[in-house]
Swiss-Prot record:
PLAC domain: residues covered: 1079-1117
Cofactor or coenzyme needed: Zn(2+)
Record lineage: Eukaryota, Metazoa, Chordata, Craniata, Vertebrata
Signal peptide extent: 1-21
Residue ranges occupied by any Disintegrin domain in the UniProt entry: 495-557
Domain Peptidase M12B stretches: 250-468
Glycosylation sites: 99, 172, 222, 234, 724, 956
Gene: ADAMTS6
SMART domains in alphabetical order: TSP1
Stated name of the protein: A disintegrin and metalloproteinase with thrombospondin motifs 6
Disulfide cross-links: 326-387, 362-369, 381-463, 420-447, 490-512, 501-519, 507-542, 532-547, 570-607, 574-612, 585-597, 911-954, 915-959, 926-943
Post-translational modification summary for this protein: The precursor is cleaved by a furin endopeptidase.
Record-level GO BP terms: aorta development; cardiac septum development; coronary vasculature development; extracellular matrix organization; kidney development; proteolysis
């Protein structure tokens, strides 16, 4: 009853909000009068308005103050409508005292339904009527639910423990309802839900659909996913990324578009209700805990196309239709809203767009076929790729839409590039490449969970982080199978004449009559809530593919985090590694639609932070060297770390030693690898994570100017100077001595010159630019630290090191021309009593602007706030400054101009053949990034470099032998049960060679004999032979023949009917010779006459003929 109430609350507002189109909500009846004739029973009642105690107030039940408001007006004032109402009515021998409260949170102010003609939007409504109420029956609060609207009288449902009652105003057929008199009350019709006859209420299915029985075809009888066109994720995004491995709630604000074919098929009266019912199922699928993330599908905008749009081409060709739709939806994307506010134009922003069409779409051609969905892989949050096209096949379309949105989230098919759905692993689920009766489309596989988690953790779903101020659509909790029964679900798929034709496993597969009157299935389960029956359950309904007792629904249990696992093995043995710990959402595990856990699911900590022994190989260098024995483009190289600019710090970029190129050998270094040599920050999961100077991951500990972790800068003195002595050219001159233990060393020319900075030890051993030899600018490991020698072409040269130095050093200059001046500064250690806190003050300061996070298309610069000493402006730990006075960090946009065009290269799609040579393709696009999360597609001519290949051969290896079956023989015997036989050979893939049977897998060998029957065999029958010779050579005699009872096989049988047995003997007559026998002849019986004894017996001897033939017998008689 709770479910029914929530659904009817939703349906009621939907009906009333669409009253500008049709005042009558029964979708196939031309009048209320006609509808009432189809009710088994109903009653009339006159409701009255009363107070809380039931005392009469008025006959007026209509809300005179309600009005439809546009978003451009002031927000609705709840005081304009009565927030609390009480009504009384009587029917079916019962009295109903209604206690109602105004429902102001039914839908968000974002949600609109728009109807578009050829010139764009024609009409829209936004559900802002102030006349929707929910409540209960007075004194029965816990057992009753009421959802009513009084926009034009009482319209809605009253749900009690034993029955649901529908109530609506009785229409006045003689007067305009606006002028109807309420002085004596307005009659209303009330009827029970049980009075509704089970018949098809929707007569608008005039667009026929083709029959299809697509068992075993790709997803929902074929799904296609285009490759990802997204740019690699890098540091050009302006959004702050969420910490990895953290479960947070996401909100997918969705635009749903129905084409004119949908309007023609479902009719304007039902299109909104139907689409939102489908999206309700989609939302529920994404709320399933098996997804491993909390994702809310929110319908922010519904567009119903009543005519073709000028810039939108929708037809059977799925690829072209998707491309057109993605561009079109981007063109109408509201940029005035960020998802948290209501835009001035009243149009809601959307993150994802869904097109639903009645076209029988097909990928790669403009003809009908089995394709049901098409989407861009990993396109979510990219304005031109966060979209999908879906063929409407009834409520089962929800599974298609959820599947295609899954592709937008970066999911691949189960079993394609992963183990899910393969032998020995968990069964394929909602992302199955092929749907069968064994597929469970109500939940997600572990592979799908990993794909979406990786997508969201990588920062590509940041557009989903903003939570709308209110849920854009309050989905009904009622099961869709209760709204649309099995027959109606069949009609959605196969047309108005279809109905359910198999009733066994309806929760697993819905079988329907097609137009050709065949019982077919798409292997799509019936919607949840569809009535079912089993041997153990007399009346049940479907729940997640199973038949459960009617009315039962698992209790919703939200998930809770389990305990953290033990810390895992450290990623490094020294030098600072990372260890991780996991926890699972299983205490309890979410069930019955309960929410998945929010919060951190994986945590990290530093480990083995002690320095590696002297002489140890650099950790990044070792990772590059691991590729020395792996061929690269057919050759072997020795690889060294590439430390130049323009690459991701946590990708393993290696330089081919002795060659002028580098490449990315791995997308991520091993966890614990330093992001760069001069930072303690380390890489985790391919991202740079901050490490404090205490070597603790995420620590705020900071080095002071003396490189003391957490210090206040009091253990060293700052040395600064300017060397501008005029010196003779052509030799080395000393600039400054740097004592042992010095830190933050900087030596820099004040202007460009032909002179060179050099560095040597106290013992005159040159480390940089010695012996009149000029070194290439690079990093030099000297005195226990790294000196960076830089000589740009357009700037003065410099020498820098963090220190501390392990020996005394001397900075020299090799003079080739006049000394223009050299500045130097460094900090030297001192011995001081106390911390220095009383000698110097500290203050917050903004650091200089950071480098722009992107070179083009919009980046961000930040000014970090640090704590500094007042005496020398050096940075110290934050705890030395007053936390209450800390100013906010500054941020500004930078480099907003579009990026140069570049090629986007998508992932290779599956090979067209698994062996014997196939082809594989990938998407190659010329794109230009024009914003932090937005790019545009250009013509190929826009990119100046060579166009990458889009197609290449694959799987050229020979296929293994395979079984080939020849044609079946005829059925033997010709009737009754028998067998057909055929020859099965082990052949090569091209069928040119025959191999021994042992070379083909025995388990996959096709059968060589099957049972058959050509119909019932005929019954046994009497079979007669030819008649024998007549027994008399002259006159009458006898003929004999064989008579046998034989089966259809020719075998003797005793099953023939004696009553129809043919005679085996008959009388015959032979022609007699007329020449008389002479008296001299011997008197004897003619040999051929066998009946002479009968002649004597019947006294025929007196006759001349018989006496002559039987002379001997007749002698003496």
């Amino acid at each position: 009853m709770e479910i029914l109430w929530k659904t009817l609350t939703w349906i009621l507002s939907l009906i009333m909000a669409s009253s500008e189109f049709h005042s009558d909500h029964r979708l196939s009846y031309s009048s209320q009068e006609e509808f009432l004739t189809y009710l088994e029973h109903y009653q009339l009642t006159i409701p009255i308005r009363v107070d809380q105690n039931g005392a009469f107030l008025s006959f007026t039940v209509k809300n005179d103050k309600h009005s439809r408001r546009r978003r451009s007006m002031d927000p609705i004032d709840p005081q304009q409508a009565v927030s609390k109402l009480f009504f009384k009515l009587s029917a079916y021998g019962k009295h109903f005292h209604l206690n109602l409260t105004l429902n102001t949170d039914f839908v968000s102010k974002h949600f609109t339904v728009e109807y578009w003609g050829k010139d764009g939007p024609q009409w829209k409504h936004d559900f802002l009527d102030n006349c929707h109420y929910t409540g209960y029956l007075q004194d029965q609060r816990s057992t009753t639910k009421v959802a009513l609207s009084n926009c034009v009288g009482l319209h809605g449902v009253i749900a009690t423990e034993d029955e649901e009652y529908f109530i609506e105003p009785l229409k006045n057929t003689t007067e305009d309802s606006k002028h109807f008199s309420y002085e004596n009350g307005h009659p209303h019709v009330i009827y029970k839900k049980s009075a509704l006859q089970q018949r098809h209420l929707y007569d608008h299915s005039h667009c026929g659909v083709s029959d299809f029985t697509r068992s075993g075809k790709p997803w929902w009888l074929n799904d296609t996913s285009t490759v990802s066109y997204s740019l690699p994720i890098n540091n050009t995004h302006i959004h702050h990324r969420q910490k990895r491995s953290v479960s947070i709630e996401r909100f997918v604000e969705t635009l749903v578009v129905a084409d004119k074919m949908m309007v023609g098929y479902h009719g304007r009266k039902d299109i909104e209700h139907y689409i939102l019912s489908v999206m309700n199922i989609v939302a529920k699928l994404y709320r399933d805990s098996s997804l491993g993330n909390v994702v809310n599908i929110i319908v922010a905008r519904l567009i119903v196309l009543t005519e073709d749009q000028p810039n939108l081409e929708i037809n059977h060709h799925a690829d072209k239709s998707l491309d057109s739709f993605c561009k079109w939806q981007k063109s109408i994307l509201s940029h005035q809203s960020d998802g948290n506010t209501i835009p001035e134009n009243g149009i809601a922003h959307h993150d994802n767009a869904v097109l639903i069409t009645r076209y029988d779409i097909c990928t790669y051609k403009n003809k009908p076929c089995g394709t049901l969905g098409l989407a861009s892989v990993a396109g979510m949050c990219e304005p031109e790729r966060s979209c999908s096209i879906n063929e409407d096949i009834g409520l089962g379309s929800a599974f298609t839409i959820a599947h295609e949105i899954g592709h937008n989230f970066g999911m691949n098919h189960d079993g394609i590039g992963n183990s899910c759905g393969t032998k020995g692993h968990e069964a394929a689920k909602l992302m199955a490449a092929h749907i069968t009766a064994n597929t469970n489309p109500f939940s997600w596989s572990a592979c799908s969970r990993d794909y979406i988690t990786s997508f969201l953790d990588s920062g590509r779903g940041t557009c989903l982080d903003n939570e709308p101020p209110k849920r854009d659509f309050l989905y009904p909790a009622v099961a869709p199978g209760q709204v649309y029964d099995a027959d109606e679900q069949c009609r959605f798929q196969y047309g108005a004449t279809s109905r359910q034709c198999k009733y066994g496993e309806v929760c697993r597969e819905l079988w329907c009559l097609s137009k050709s009157n065949r019982c077919v299935t798409n292997s799509i389960p019936a919607a949840e809530g569809t009535l079912c029956q089993t041997g153990n359950i007399e009346k049940g309904w479907c729940y997640q593919g199973d038949c459960v007792p009617f009315g039962t629904w698992p209790q919703s249990i939200d998930g809770g985090w389990g305990p953290w696992s033990l810390w895992g093995e450290c990623s490094r043995t020294c030098g600072g590694g990372v260890s991780s710990s996991l926890r699972h959402c299983d205490s309890p595990a979410p069930s019955g639609g309960g929410k998945y856990c929010l919060g951190e699911r994986k945590r990290y900590r530093s480990c083995n932070t002690d320095p590696c022994p002297l002489g140890s190989r650099d950790f990044r260098e070792k990772q590059c060297a691991d590729f020395d024995n792996m061929p690269f483009r057919g050759k072997y190289y020795n690889w060294k770390p590439y430390t130049g600019g323009g690459v991701k710090p946590c990708a393993l970029n290696c330089l081919a030693e002795g060659y002028n190129f580098y490449t990315e050998r791995a997308p991520a270094v091993i966890d614990g690898t330093q992001c760069n040599a001069d930072s303690l920050d380390i890489c985790i999961n391919g991202e740079c994570k901050h490490v404090g100077c205490d070597n603790i991951l995420g620590s705020d500990a900071r080095e002071d100017r003396c490189r003391v972790c957490g210090g206040d800068g009091s253990t060293c003195d700052a040395i600064e100077g300017f060397f501008n002595d005029s010196l003779p050219r052509g030799g080395y001159m000393e600039v400054v001595q740097i004592p042992r233990g010095s830190v933050h060393i900087e030596v820099r020319e004040v202007a460009m010159s032909k002179n060179y900075i050099a560095l040597k030890s106290e013992g005159d051993d040159y480390y940089i630019n010695g012996a009149w030899t000029i070194d290439w600018p690079r990093k030099f490991d000297v005195a226990g630290t790294a000196f960076h020698y830089k000589r740009p072409t357009d700037e003065p040269e410099s020498l820098e090191a963090l220190g501390p130095t392990s020996e005394n050093l001397i900075v020299m200059v090799l003079l080739q021309e006049q000394n223009l001046g050299i500045r130097y500064k460094f900090n030297v250690p001192i011995t001081r009593t106390g911390s220095g806190d009383n000698e110097v003050g500290f203050t917050w300061n903004h650091q200089p602007w950071s480098e722009c996070s992107a070179t083009c298309a919009g980046g961000v610069q930040r000014q970090e706030v640090v704590c500094k000493r007042l005496d020398d402006n050096s940075i110290v730990q934050n705890n030395y400054c007053d936390p209450d006075s800390k100013p906010p960090e500054n941020q500004r946009a930078c480099n907003t101009e579009p990026c140069p065009p570049e090629w986007f290269i998508g992932d290779w799609l599956e090979c067209s053949k698994t062996c014997d040579g196939g082809m594989r393709t990938r998407a190659v696009l010329c794109i230009r990034k024009i914003g932090p999360s937005e790019e545009e597609t250009l013509d190929y001519s826009g990119c100046l470099t060579h166009r990458p290949v889009e197609k290449e051969p694959c799987n050229n290896q020979s296929c293994p032998p395979q079984w080939v079956a020849l044609d079946w023989s005829e059925c033997t015997p010709k009737c009754g049960p028998g067998f057909k036989h055929r020859i099965v050979l082990c052949k090569s893939s091209d069928l040119s060679k025959t191999f021994p049977a042992a070379q083909c897998p025995e388990e996959s060998k096709p059968p060589v004999r099957i049972r058959c029957s050509l119909g019932r065999c005929p019954p046994p029958r009497w079979v007669t032979g030819d008649w024998g010779q007549c027994s008399a050579q002259c006159g009458l005699g006898q003929q004999m023949r064989t008579v046998q009872c034989l089966s259809y096989t020719g075998q003797a049988s005793s099953d023939c009917l004696e009553t129809v047995r043919p005679p085996s003997m008959q009388q015959c007559e032979s022609k007699c010779d007329s020449t008389p026998i002479s008296n001299t002849e011997e008197c004897k019986d003619v040999n051929k006459v066998a009946y002479c004894p009968l002649v004597l017996k019947f006294k025929f001897c007196s006759r001349a003929y018989f006496r002559q033939m039987c002379c001997k017998t007749c002698q003496g008689h």
